[in-house]
Each structure stands twice: as structure tokens, then as C-alpha cells.
């Protein structure tokens, strides 16, 4: 039985919201290269790929502080040093995303959802300045009606603000929505928003298995969500998905756009 058949018996969600890093794309190689360049410029030894893999998922500021601390706990990192290091990291990461790749099954799943008329949104803790260019490079940006970066709203995941915002914009309820991610922050945000969450085993969760966070469903491949997508009897095959060239309009939610719609969110209580 597919993931959708388990979570939405007899129907489909009206809205599917996705995390980005560790869910749709493997960006750790480029992030690690930027972290190591930052550390070298500060006269420190590089951290390496596997260390960075355990540190990502909570935004650039936290990643930089973890790199300076050499671990998950970064409370003792000097704020001035962290600010200097963040600028170095942002400059380094902006230069190249050549090592970033889309995970297998992602494009098939996005095409299938679009063919079914399911609205899609992207909610990431990655700074918004990187999100649009990266999505364009990966050729998946046109699938998403709403795109929210980590510094778009006053809060980032695990706060549910972005999920609540997108559901309000889409005019759907939590019961009609699904969030797909790979980390504790994703699961916590979904639960706080009252939304079912699918956890992916291949992503970044600080070295912890995603099932330890108790998402609604755990899968190894996004295509496990799709009911019979490779079964010709359904009339929808992977060949159909790959041939689809339709494009949807996309709303990239920037900081300026946020100021225009903040009044519409007044009924939500922002958590400190």
C-alpha cells in the first residue's frame, strides 16, 4: 500500500509541503566545501563532509556556529566570531552549487503530484537568497506554488509559522495537508501545525534515524507515496510523468512580500 493510501484513504492531500535539503536535494557536498573554506580562512582545520552532514538542517547561522564549536552544541561560540564566520560562509556557498544533486524519485513524484492537481510548496531553513537560484539550477522550482526560505518569516522550522502561512494562502486545512521532510525540525513543525508528516530515511537528522522522531510515516524513496505510479493499469506511468512539460505559476515568498501579507497572519500567534 502506498504512502498516500495509508495517510489519505480514498483521496489525496490538497497540499503537499516539502523540505529542501536532505529531502529533495543532497546539498551536503557544497555546504561542506563552504564550511571548510570558511574554517580555513579563520585558520582552523576543515570539518569534513560527514561532520557537516550531522550539523545541517537548522539554517546557515546554526550550521556556522556548529562548525565553530566542532559539534552540535554551540552555546559557547562567541557571537562576534560567529557573525564574521557567517559572512565568510555565505560568500563561499554563493559561489557554487556544482556538487548538489536531486535525489532519485524526486522529479517523478513532483510530476505525478502536479498531474493530479495537488498544490505544492517548499519550506526550507536555507537562506532565501540561495533558494531560487538553486531550484532553477536543479530544474524543480516550477513545481512549487509557494517557496519560503529560512529568513523569509520571523520564525523558521521547527516553528510551524511557515506551514500555517502556506496553508492559509492555499485555503486548506491541516487535515488536507502533508509535510515531507527528513529531520526532527520538520517533524516538530508538522506536528505543531497539526499536519501529518512523512520522514525520509536518506536525509540529514544529526545522525539520528528519522523514525526516532515519530513521523506519521517513514519511507526510503519519495515514490513510495504514489499509488501505483509505475503500474500501467492505473493509466499513469513513470513514462507519462517524465513526458510532462506543464509549468505552474510560482510565488516566491520574499521578505518584501512577507511585509505585504503580515496583516493576514495577525491571527496566528508568533512564538518567541
Curated annotation (Swiss-Prot):
Pathway participation: Organic acid metabolism; glycolate biosynthesis; glycolate from 2-phosphoglycolate: step 1/1
Which UniProt keywords are present, listed alphabetically?
Carbohydrate metabolism, Hydrolase, Magnesium, Metal-binding
Record keyword Glycosyltransferase present: no
The organism sits in which domain of life?
Bacteria
GO cellular component terms, alphabetically, are: cytosol
Residues the record marks as active site: 19
Which SUPFAM superfamilies is this protein grouped with? Answer: HAD-like
Q: Which cofactor does it need?
A: Mg(2+)
Instruction: State a single Pfam family of this protein.
Output: HAD_2
Please list the reactions this protein catalyses. 2-phosphoglycolate + H2O = glycolate + phosphate
Known EC number(s)?
3.1.3.18
Q: Which NCBIfam families match?
A: HAD-SF-IA-v1, HAD-SF-IA-v3, HAD-SF-IIIA, PGP_bact, PRK13222.1-2, PRK13223.1
| Function, as annotated | Specifically catalyzes the dephosphorylation of 2-phosphoglycolate. Is involved in the dissimilation of the intracellular 2-phosphoglycolate formed during the DNA repair of 3'-phosphoglycolate ends, a major class of DNA lesions induced by oxidative stress.
Protein known as = Phosphoglycolate phosphatase
Per the UniProt entry, what species is this protein from, by scientific name? Pseudomonas putida (strain ATCC 47054 / DSM 6125 / CFBP 8728 / NCIMB 11950 / KT2440)
Amino acid at each position: 500500500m502506498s504512502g498516500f493510501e495509508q495517510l489519505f484513504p480514498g483521496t489525496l492531500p490538497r497540499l503537499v509541503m516539502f523540505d529542501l535539503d536532505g529531502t529533495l536535494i543532497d546539498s551536503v557536498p557544497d555546504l561542506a566545501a563552504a564550511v571548510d573554506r570558511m574554517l580555513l580562512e579563520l585558520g582552523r582545520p576543515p570539518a569534513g563532509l560527514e561532520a557537516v552532514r550531522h550539523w545541517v538542517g537548522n539554517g546557515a547561522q546554526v550550521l556556522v556556529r556548529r562548525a565553530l564549536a566542532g559539534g552540535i552544541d554551540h552555546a559557547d561560540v562567541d557571537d562576534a566570531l560567529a557573525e564574521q564566520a557567517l559572512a565568510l560562509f555565505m560568500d563561499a556557498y554563493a559561489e557554487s552549487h556544482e556538487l548538489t544533486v536531486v535525489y532519485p524519485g524526486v522529479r517523478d513524484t513532483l510530476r505525478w503530484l502536479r498531474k493530479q492537481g495537488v498544490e505544492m510548496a517548499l519550506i526550507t531553513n536555507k537562506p532565501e537568497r540561495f533558494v531560487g537560484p538553486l531550484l532553477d539550477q536543479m530544474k524543480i522550482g516550477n513545481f512549487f506554488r509557494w517557496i519560503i526560505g529560512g529568513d523569509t518569516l520571523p520564525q523558521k522550522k521547527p516553528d510551524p509559522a511557515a506551514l500555517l502561512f502556506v496553508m492559509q494562502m492555499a485555503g486548506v486545512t491541516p487535515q488536507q495537508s502533508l509535510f515531507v521532510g527528513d529531520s526532527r525540525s520538520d517533524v516538530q513543525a508538522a506536528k505543531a501545525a497539526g499536519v501529518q508528516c512523512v520522514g525520509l530515511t536518506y536525509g540529514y537528522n544529526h545522525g539520528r534515524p528519522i523514525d526516532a522522531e515519530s513521523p506519521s510515516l517513514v519511507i526510503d524513496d519519495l515514490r513510495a507515496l504514489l499509488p501505483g505510479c509505475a503500474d500501467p493499469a492505473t493509466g499513469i506511468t513513470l513514462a507519462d510523468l517524465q513526458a510532462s512539460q506543464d509549468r505552474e505559476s510560482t510565488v516566491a515568498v520574499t521578505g518584501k512580500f512577507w511585509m505585504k501579507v503580515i496583516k493576514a497572519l495577525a491571527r496566528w500567534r508568533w512564538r518567541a
